[in-house]
Amino acid sequence: MAIGSGTFTLADYALYSNQPAVQAVSMSLIDYGNVLQDIPMVTKQTLQANGVRFEGNLPVINWSPLNAEGVTVHAQPTPYQEQAYLMRNYVDVDKYIVLDQNAITDTRASQAKAVLKALTYDVNFKFFKNAHDGTGDPNAPVGLRARIDDAAGANKFGVRPENKIDCGGATADISQAGISAAKGNAFLEMLDLLLWSVGSQDGTGIVLYMNDYMKRRLNFVLRSLGTTGGLDESKDQFNRTITTYKNAVIRDPGVKADQTTRIIAGNAIPAGSGSVGETAAGVDSTGASANFTSIYAVNFGTDYFFGWQFTDGPNVQDLGLINNGVIYRTLIDWAVGLMNNNTRSIARLFDIKIG
């Protein structure tokens, strides 16, 4: 299923909303590269959503001769439940700052933009790295890495263990010093396996998430194998450049709120003290063994991986001068959750040697 088929994404909501404040917030989230722009959103007023998925428990089909009766078959899907998580923030500005005629810009608008920028950094990080194992934020959704890692254990999120794919390290070395035709082809084979693992061999409906170094290195690999153009590029409805591998959209989730640390680690520096990336086992690290990175693949759609929201899009309310008489307040909140409806929705390719 293609991204957003039959559902509204954040981008659609920004285009259709007739509330200037909501439109501004939605567009800001898109401009800052929030991953929520990719996720098809279903509106459902519930804090918990229930679903079922088939995890190898399909019915056995009966074949019979003429004049024989049919055989009753029954499928027993696996039930699951996800919960909504709340993003709730106030933007408070003193009334005298609001009334100051010497202000160059709208102070409340500037503060709101700063909050939205911070929100994007935080959402992007949590979408990939948040965990409920004591190391992350229990008030935010479980991220892709933890969902995929859990497949080999409790498998609470319906992900096949095979969807955590080892690229092979030195076998598919795409560092500038180690690249060769054989290794480049080995890497592309594993990248195609990543697409296959999320149910779309040609990449339709898929978003590939990688950091900026990995994106440049992918172009480098394609050119080194004799292709002239590298990755394909087109424009979206906001006239932004969209890069694709086959039909899969490529996105870089960027950096954390410190505006330095990459969300998907890997700085392509050869093994040494300057390396900041992942180990061959896919663990974030620094130093001599941290010259690897990962690529995440997500099949977005209501049959695969999607989200639900309590109301249509983010709630933006100008609460005006609150009852203390000195503060103008703007409320920005949103109740959202993530749902995995298929065992072939999300996957990770790790142990990619880029340094």
Tell where the protein language model's regions lie, with residue ranges.
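Short amphipathic alpha-helical segments
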Residues: 107, 111, 183-186
